[in-house]
């Protein structure tokens, strides 16, 4: 059935009484669940109109399918004739599947009784709302939101009905902006006032908003205000006074930014703006009223004087007895945590700003301290989430992103980096003032960090709580108690794009980035984020559509043959490569070339001699599913270790691969995964993470023959070094020092157990007499605690200021050497059967790690520079350009898997891809044209070669490459 709208209307017929036409627009989906093996979905939406009481379906329509995305944009409108009192709309999101049944992605059930009515005189007749997708049953795995616009078409009954509808709508979370309101020209929605203390907003399983009063444990549909809860003022005053006293008790104020937003509890949809009063007098007016949104165009710009008067009228600033006198405007994220807090001395103009120009001047800011009278006007700062206070992210007419600093009315192309400095602890409340930290704008030339949180050590280290914490940490090294040297701070999830707490990145005069550790007051060239292995970093693969705008001065054009190229108007050059993919944060860290290591390695290889009276090769035939035990029996059965120096020849059962180097690299890779698996009890994770390994001191309890297995592992490590292969493992630094026979120092413990290190360092810098420590250690094994003397009769010798250095040395010796001495001796026994230990000692502990395990990070630029092409391919061939683009868009883990797919190992030689070895010596990575576009790529690991078919599109190449890397296993032919 069609109407004057020119669109079909579903549902009831026109002669039905009390019916209205509902316009429904399915706008988009947000962060839907992944159903595809490639991390995407093909979503569409089914709209079902049904009678609520009878569960009878009246109409069913469906949107189009959006391919390969988790954030689809449909923008499709439908019209329904409904009875608002007893009809409902069910929105179901599905992932289209051509082979099997479509996967369920979530649903939203919406009642129709409280929807707004359109006003034809308004510029924006109705607004959208994000609905949390709900599961259909407890087995459903859904996530994300569905963005909808729903409003009734106006009747001919006049304006009274509309006004009545609007008043009713405002009570249920929908907002209809009045056309006569001055804020109707704004692009932002007018936010509701904040909830009273003790109230919480939630959404039920039907998508309806309700409010919970935690003070008297009741719920209601109506949004409360401070006027509604005046009868409970005594409880509110007592509760907020307790919170204010708690804040004044704290030695300083912590301002931090969440590293990863979390979904809000109960499915709450993030609200726009709210006013939070920081330590204000409850007797005064503390209700934060909603501020007007910024103007939509230059024509509707509000003058600073008018905005100042409006803010002065709406914000009630009442000083309390302590002189803490202001309210801070913040933006509440889904995690409902404090992001930034700012009070400036001028009103920021919210008008439309021109595209970026050079930043001019520094933002003016003021510090409000106790006893000072603040200015009557408080700046309304429009802040984009994740940016410093007063900064906003916008896009120009060409889609390029720029940043607006409303504090000093400037624009810039560079994303601001917020530096949050925390003051030292202080015992008095008068020193716990709030300070404004100005954002610093830098142009990072390496891995950038949007946020740096500086954690200063606590003052007053001689306080009794600190001493107790040190003593507890020393008495029980496995104690989870936090270190007394770091100030309390929110526990964030590890996110690769952020530096660790207390670190900062700066640029040296020569353009090289360096890193400052404010915790230890040291600097280093090494990025602290790269201490995490690639499989522990959380940065996901990039989408070509999410790269953002081109850098300033760049232009994208289409060639006559349909290929995209890029013009740099700054240097007047053209290139095929996308400049956005050349960011060091995407390409990976540069390979730190070491000439000294190269010379040592060449000398080391010359001194290794192969005995003359051994067979031509050492053969092993193994099963993949039992590689550990079969390798152990085969290698330990060799009575003469020199036989292992013959050429390795590995065969996997039921595979036809010929080992010319590639199968052996695969064997070392798979065997490393098994040998170093803590499940077998030979190794364990260090105290601070779950990827760095150390010898398990209790390995004898797990395996009676554990020393024989350590000898086997030593032989495998010696085999790898002798034959130029790499192990896949991460060991603590003291492990390599023990191999070299070097003394382990206190600094070596910092990266292994930071809490234990901080405790020992405190003892070194202070008098430990009052701690009542003895020369003994409490060791816990399987729930039982044992006391171990560090020296004869150590439990009777007290640690004093005179003998504390001896105590620290004995603790380190016990922690790293004494407990695992037998295991390390067995490991070195097997290792030195193939390599003389004196020859190994020409390397230091860092170089020994690189010799045995190589580099864990992939520098794509270095990989690309040391690659060759055959059979019609060249560096500028479209398929080659697509291949490297696909590699750049991969996350670090997928690059490692690709490297393992084409070379047989997941590690890179010390000096990069220039030193890749094949079956007959150095062999650069090679890409050769082969096959037809219907086939998957194939690899020859012995020659470091990838056979790549001439695919017709980038999407096809990327899909086939990922499929080959993630699903291929086994050898056939020469490898």
Curated annotation (Swiss-Prot):
Expression across tissues: Ubiquitously expressed, with highest levels in prostate, pancreas, and kidney. Expressed in melanocytes.
Gene3D superfamilies according to UniProt: 2.20.70.10, C2 domain, Hect, E3 ligase catalytic domain, Hect, E3 ligase catalytic domains
Ranges where the WW domain occurs: 193-226, 385-418, 497-530, 548-581
Modification after translation (UniProt): Phosphorylated by SGK1 or PKA; which impairs interaction with SCNN. Interaction with YWHAH inhibits dephosphorylation. Auto-ubiquitinated. Deubiquitinated by USP36, no effect on NEDD4L protein levels. Both proteins interact and regulate each other's ubiquitination levels.
Modified residues (N-acetylalanine): 2
Residue(s) carrying Phosphothreonine: 318, 367
Predominant cellular place of this UniProt entry's protein: cytoplasm
Active-site residues, as the UniProt record annotates them: 942 (glycyl thioester intermediate)
Keywords from the named record: Acetylation, Cytoplasm, Differentiation, Disease variant, Endosome, Golgi apparatus, Host-virus interaction, Phosphoprotein, Repeat, Transferase, Ubl conjugation, Ubl conjugation pathway
Stated consequence of mutating residue 897 to Q: In PVNH7; increased degradation; changed function in regulation of TOR signaling
PROSITE patterns, per the entry: C2, HECT, WW_DOMAIN_1, WW_DOMAIN_2
Database matches in PANTHER family: E3 UBIQUITIN-PROTEIN LIGASE NEDD4-LIKE, HECT DOMAIN UBIQUITIN-PROTEIN LIGASE
Protein name per the record: E3 ubiquitin-protein ligase NEDD4-like
Source organism of this protein record: Homo sapiens (Human)
Gene that encodes the chain: NEDD4L
């Amino acid at each position: 059935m069609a109407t004057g709208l020119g669109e079909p209307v579903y549902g009831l017929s026109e002669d039905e009484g009390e019916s209205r036409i509902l316009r429904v627009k399915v706008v988009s989906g947000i962060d839907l669940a992944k159903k595809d093996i490639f991390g995407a979905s093909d979503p569409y939406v089914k709209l079902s109109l049904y009678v609520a009481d009878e569960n009878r379906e009246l109409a069913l329509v469906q949107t189009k399918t959006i391919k390969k995305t988790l954030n689809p944009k449909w923008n499709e409108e439908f019209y329904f004739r409904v009875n608002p009192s007893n009809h409902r709309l069910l929105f179901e999101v599905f992932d289209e599947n051509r082979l099997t049944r479509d996967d369920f992605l979530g649903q939203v059930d919406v009642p129709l009784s409280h929807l707004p009515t359109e006003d034809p005189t308004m510029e924006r007749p109705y607004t959208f709302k994000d609905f949390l997708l709900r599961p259909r049953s407890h087995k459903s795995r859904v996530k994300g939101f569905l963005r909808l616009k729903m409003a009734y078409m106006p009747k001919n009954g006049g304006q009274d009905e509309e006004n009545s509808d609007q008043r009713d709508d405002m009570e249920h979370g929908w907002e209809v902006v009045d056309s006569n309101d001055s804020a109707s020209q704004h692009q932002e929605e007018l936010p509701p006032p904040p909830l009273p203390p003790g109230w919480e907003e939630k959404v039920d399983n039907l998508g309806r908003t309700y409010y919970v009063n935690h003070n008297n444990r009741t719920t209601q549909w109506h949004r409360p205000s401070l006027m509604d809860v005046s009868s409970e003022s005594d409880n509110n005053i007592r509760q907020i006074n307790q919170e204010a006293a708690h804040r004044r008790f704290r030695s300083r104020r912590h301002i931090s930014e969440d590293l990863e937003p979390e979904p809000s509890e109960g499915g709450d949809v993030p609200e726009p703006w709210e006013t939070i009063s920081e330590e204000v007098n409850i007797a005064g007016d503390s209700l934060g009223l909603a501020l007007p949104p910024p103007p939509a165009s230059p024509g509707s710009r509000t003058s600073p004087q008018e905005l100042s008067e409006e803010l002065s009228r709406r914000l009630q600033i009442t000083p309390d007895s302590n002189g803490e006198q202001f309210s801070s405007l913040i933006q509440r994220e889904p995690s409902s945590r404090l992001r930034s807090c700012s009070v400036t001395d001028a009103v920021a103009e919210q008008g439309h700003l021109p595209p970026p120009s050079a930043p001019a001047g520094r933002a003016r800011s003021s510090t409000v301290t106790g006893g000072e009278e603040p200015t009557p006007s408080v700046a309304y700062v429009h802040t984009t989430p994740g940016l410093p206070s007063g900064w906003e992210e916008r896009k120009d007419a060409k889609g390029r992103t720029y940043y607006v600093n409303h504090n000093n009315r400037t624009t810039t192309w560079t994303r601001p980096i917020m530096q949050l400095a925390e003051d030292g602890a202080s015992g008095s409340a008068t020193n716990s003032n709030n300070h404004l930290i100005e954002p610093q704008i830098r142009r990072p030339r390496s891995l950038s960090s949007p946020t740096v949180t500086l954690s200063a050590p606590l003052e007053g280290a001689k306080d009794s709580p600190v001493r107790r914490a040190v003593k507890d940490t020393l008495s029980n090294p496995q104690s989870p108690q936090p270190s007394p040297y770091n100030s309390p701070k929110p526990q964030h999830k590890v996110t690769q794009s952020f530096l660790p707490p207390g670190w900062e990145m700066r640029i040296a005069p020569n353009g090289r980035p360096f890193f400052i550790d404010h915790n230890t007051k040291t600097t280093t060239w090494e990025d602290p984020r790269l201490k995490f292995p690639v499989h522990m970093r959380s940065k996901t693969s990039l989408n070509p559509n999410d790269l953002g705008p081109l850098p300033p001065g760049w232009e994208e054009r289409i060639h006559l043959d349909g290929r995209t190229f890029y013009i740099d108007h700054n240097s007047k050059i053209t290139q095929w490569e996308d400049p956005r993919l050349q960011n060091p944060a995407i390409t990976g860290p540069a390979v730190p070339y070491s000439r000294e290591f190269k010379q040592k390695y060449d000398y080391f290889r010359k001194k290794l001699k192969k005995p003359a009276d051994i067979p031509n090769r050492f053969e092993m035939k193994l099963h993949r599913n039992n590689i550990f035990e079969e390798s152990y029996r085969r290698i330990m059965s060799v009575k003469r270790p020199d036989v292992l120096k013959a050429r390795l020849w590995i065969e996997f059962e039921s595979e036809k691969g010929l080992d010319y180097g590639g199968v052996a690299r695969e064997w070392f890779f798979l065997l490393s995964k098994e040998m170093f698996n803590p499940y077998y009890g030979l190794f364990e994770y260090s105290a601070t993470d779950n990827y760095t390994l150390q010898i398990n001191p209790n390995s004898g309890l797990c395996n009676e023959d554990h020393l024989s297995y350590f000898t086997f592992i030593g032989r495998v490590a010696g085999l790898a070094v002798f034959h130029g292969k790499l192990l896949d493992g991460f060991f603590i630094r003291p492990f390599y020092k023990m191999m070299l026979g070097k003394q382990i120092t206190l600094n070596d413990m910092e990266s292994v157990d930071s809490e234990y290190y901080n405790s020992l360092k405190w003892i070194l810098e202070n008098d430990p007499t009052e701690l009542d420590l003895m020369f003994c250690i409490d060791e816990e094994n399987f729930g039982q605690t044992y006391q171990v003397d560090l020296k004869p009769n150590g439990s009777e010798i007290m640690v004093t200021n005179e003998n504390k250095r001896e105590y620290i040395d004995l603790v380190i010796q016990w922690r790293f050497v004494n407990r695992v001495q037998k295991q390390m001796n067995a490991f070195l026994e097997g290792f030195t059967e193939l390599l003389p230990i004196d020859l190994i000692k020409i390397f230091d502990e860092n170089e020994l790690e690189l010799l045995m395990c190589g580099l864990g990070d992939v520098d794509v630029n270095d990989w690309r520079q040391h690659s060759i092409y055959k059979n019609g391919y060249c560096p500028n061939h479209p398929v080659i350009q697509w291949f490297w683009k696909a590699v750049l868009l991969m996350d670090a883990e997928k690059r490692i898997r690709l490297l393992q797919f084409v070379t047989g190992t997941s590690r890179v030689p010390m000096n990069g891809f220039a030193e890749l070895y094949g079956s007959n010596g150095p062999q650069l990575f090679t890409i050769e044209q082969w096959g037809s576009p219907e086939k998957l790529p194939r690899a020859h690991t012995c020659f470091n070669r990838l056979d790549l078919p001439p695919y017709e599109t980038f999407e096809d190449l990327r899909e086939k490459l990922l499929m080959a890397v993630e699903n291929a296993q086994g050898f056939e032919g020469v490898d």
